[in-house]
Amino acid sequence: MAQTVRVNVPRTILDWVISIGTEDHLSENQRQNIDAWRQGAKRPTVSQLHGISDKLQVPFGYFFMDEPIDDTPPVYAKRTIGSQQPQGHPSRDLVDTIDQMTAIQDWARQDRIDNEGTRLEQVGSRTINDGSDLIVKDIRRALKIDEHWYRKSGLHDPAKAFKLLRERAEGTGILIMQNGVVGNNTHRPLDPTEFRAFTLIDPYAPLIFINKTDEPETARLFSLVHELAHVWLGADELYNDTALPTGVTRLEQVCNEVATAILLPDEDFLETWQSIPNDTTLDERMKELKKRFPVSHTALALRALKHKLISQETFQKCNQAAQTWSEETENKQGSPTFYNTELSRFDSRFLERLASSVAKGGTTYLDAYRLTGITGDTFTKLMKRAVS
């Protein structure tokens, strides 16, 4: 009979692994075993450590390290809210998502160096001292949109607006990724209260990740344009501001100014507001404005408050009614197919370049599987759709 193999895990390592993991996922039996290991009453088996590693969502190898490490991604220190506070620990869902995006960025960086060799001129091309107006002009020029781009072809619909701006941004070489779960694990949804988006700056392959659980679509659209401003400013960010976009630092103020100028230009807003008859009810006025701009009802009300077109009391009423208005105007669509969902997660140019590299032997299937989290026939079918 094979003997059960037990291993020594120092208490300092055990305590550290548990402190950075998803402890509330542990079963009562696992908690009792951990208490016994801490007291030295018995030692864990390899199988038990594997089980706890899975529940904590922490790499199995961490149990065998000589001393604790800090695996907090550097971008966590660049979060919008709380960056000046004690760091704490990000969730394992966020850590694993950033790790996957970093791996994709590393691959894309090397691919660009090998095939084109040039840096992207927009990365870090502006500073906050340049002001938001110049950054807005630069982004419009790069994305080939004019000041009133949202008036065309139903682009007041935030879903259509997001699709257009994402495609245009990808065309400039910026990687745009989005997901609502960790990889393909539907049991690990991303928390929008922890982060809405993040940007990883690199001169060859800047990457923007959008948290797809951040609702409604107008929130993701705002995050996308906000993060584009970070690319022009060459500044990493973990965007976790869930409050009204007033900004907390000059950097954030500039990025918010850029986003609002592109999505809701001041002059156009005022002209539209004044074109609506004075006796129009608030509900009807908001619905009319929503037909013109790809922003939330709250953003529209906030702009009206800024120009003293409504009172603070009316703004509060608008804010409270925003959820109802959003539900009434939401674009009801059927559920996307599996492959459409997978394609939407990845930057389109990244998938095209990856498919080409695999076909030429520059990237192994194993590495491609690791980058995408997709294997076998599913990967092959996805690549065919990506290049079709």
What are these regions (language model features)?
Residues 1-388:
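Active-site hotspot residues in diverse enzymes, especially metal/ion-binding acidic/histidine motifs
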